[in-house]
């Protein structure tokens, strides 16, 4: 097994230095951290992801690098959300939001992204109202600072739609879902995000209309999602496997058992290969 630096080097000591001397901030190597993170994610090595992020967060804290801490808390809240660890996700979300204010970054796109991430954490753990509060802040930020074709805008619209659905605001949710699909259609490999959104729309239609009344609409949305997931040009990497695993149970819920099995087979094949 290859040892990484974080496996054997202790974080810098925050108390080291001359008495009474305040150490200057020392930035952590963000590019290298993210490159290694994506490598672990592509291999679906989630234990390595956690170890890697926690190591570098300790480094950023020891080195008084608050911008580095912001980036790492953003990554950690997303990691713990995917691992369904509520307390840890909330802890890092709250810290990231706090750092935005401390750094005076409220008017930056980074702030918008942090609010999206924090809202997604709250929506994921059953607080759609709290999620929407962050999403509205992010929407004002993004629509001011980003072109509407930016993938981050599409991701925000999708997350807002999920929270609106959970709040029973179905018409607003459908409008947001369709905005998300339009944006993602302009992205390279955007088929995966579009597929997820069509499946989210199927769930929203069932919630709004009831299973029987929504049947035809749900079938249309599932067929569109399946076609997108079958796009041959999509890279068969760790993220593709993650999306397959995320989407498969939705197809199973609606009786598309062959599609469910095929998606799980693809995910397993990728994991075994990597």
Regions found by a protein language model. Give the residues of each.
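Conserved alpha-helical positions within TPR/SEL1-like repeat arrays
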Residues: 31-42, 70-82, 109-124, 151-166, ...
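Short coil/turn linking the two alpha-helices of tandem helical-hairpin repeats
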Residues: 104, 119, 146, 188, ...
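Short coil/turn linkers that connect adjacent helices within long alpha-helical scaffolds
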Residues: 23-24, 62-65, 102-106, 144-148, ...
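Amphipathic alpha-helical segments of tetratricopeptide repeats
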Residues: 54-59, 95-102, 139-144, 178-186, ...
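Residues that mark the junctions of alpha-helical repeat units in TPR/alpha-solenoid scaffolds
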Residues: 29, 49, 62, 69, ...
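Alpha-helical segment of the N-proximal tetratricopeptide repeat
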Residues: 26-63, 78-82
């Amino acid at each position: 097994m290859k040892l990484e630096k974080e496996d054997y080097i202790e974080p810098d000591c925050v108390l080291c230095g001359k008495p009474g001397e305040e150490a200057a901030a020392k930035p952590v190597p963000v590019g290298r951290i993210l490159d290694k993170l994506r490598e672990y994610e592509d291999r679906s090595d989630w234990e390595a992801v956690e170890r890697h992020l926690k190591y570098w967060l300790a480094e950023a804290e020891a080195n008084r690098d608050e911008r580095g801490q912001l980036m790492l808390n953003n990554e950690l809240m997303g990691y713990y959300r995917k691992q369904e660890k509520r307390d840890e996700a909330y802890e890092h979300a709250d810290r990231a939001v706090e750092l935005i204010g401390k750094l005076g970054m409220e008017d930056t796109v980074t702030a918008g992204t942090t609010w999206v991430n924090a809202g997604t954490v709250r929506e994921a753990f059953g607080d759609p109202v709290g999620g929407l509060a962050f999403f509205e802040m992010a929407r004002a930020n993004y629509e001011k600072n980003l072109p509407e074709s930016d993938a981050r805008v599409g991701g925000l619209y999708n997350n807002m739609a999920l929270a609106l659905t959970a709040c029973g605001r179905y018409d607003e949710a459908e409008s947001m879902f369709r905005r998300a699909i339009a944006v993602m259609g302009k992205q390279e490999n955007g088929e995966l995000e579009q597929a997820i959104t069509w499946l989210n729309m199927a769930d929203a239609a069932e919630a709004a209309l009831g299973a029987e009344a929504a049947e035809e609409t749900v079938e249309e949305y599932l067929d569109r999602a399946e076609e997108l997931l079958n796009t041959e040009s999509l890279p068969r990497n760790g993220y593709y496997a993650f999306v397959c695993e995320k989407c498969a149970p939705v197809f199973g819920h609606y009786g598309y058992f062959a599609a469910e099995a095929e998606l799980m087979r693809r995910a397993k094949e990728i994991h075994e290969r990597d």
